[in-house]
Amino acid sequence: MFIADIGGTRSRFALASQPGDIGDIVESPTGTKPLIATIEDALTALGTSASAHAAAFAVAGAVQDGCADLTNAGWSFDAAEIAAMMRFQRVTVINDFQTIAAALPLLGTDGTTKIGGGKLDIAAPMLVLGPGTGLGVAVS
């Protein structure tokens, strides 16, 4: 699977053969070239083509129905359009902090820090909050 972390200033791309098994990471500035050209460059740098792969893009911005706009970079993400142009079999576009929130339950108690009183309950709702291009927030 071709995976991408698209931030407001930097984008990171890699191939994942299975969950937790991520290969080399290719970085490039966000928005300096058209999106499709950037994806093609990343695939070339990773030594692969898109035709047999699924892709997931975690983007720094609001996502609705598989679409997102990075207004500061001039990139627009449309999962169906990217799949057709790049011949990916499947494309997912998701908010970057939503991706982090989805992974929180996998961390277990060793990978979390309790803030405030009470007992840590890994099954309880958890919050991700952090700076990036803007202020990212997500709940798991």
Q: Locations of the language-model features?
A:
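Short glycine-rich, Thr/Ser-proximal phosphate-binding strand/loop in the N-terminal lobe
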Residues: 1-45, 49
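Solvent-exposed alpha-helices and their adjacent loops that cap or buttress functional pockets
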Residues: 6-7, 117-123, 128-131
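Short beta-strand scaffold segments in enzyme catalytic cores
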Residues: 11-15, 129, 134-140
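Short amphipathic alpha-helical segments
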Residues: 15-16, 40, 68-70, 105-106, ...
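Short beta-strand-loop/turn "lid" adjacent to the catalytic site in phosphate-handling enzymes
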Residues: 48-93, 98-111, 128
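FAD-binding glycine-rich core of flavoenzymes that anchor FAD
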Residues: 112-116
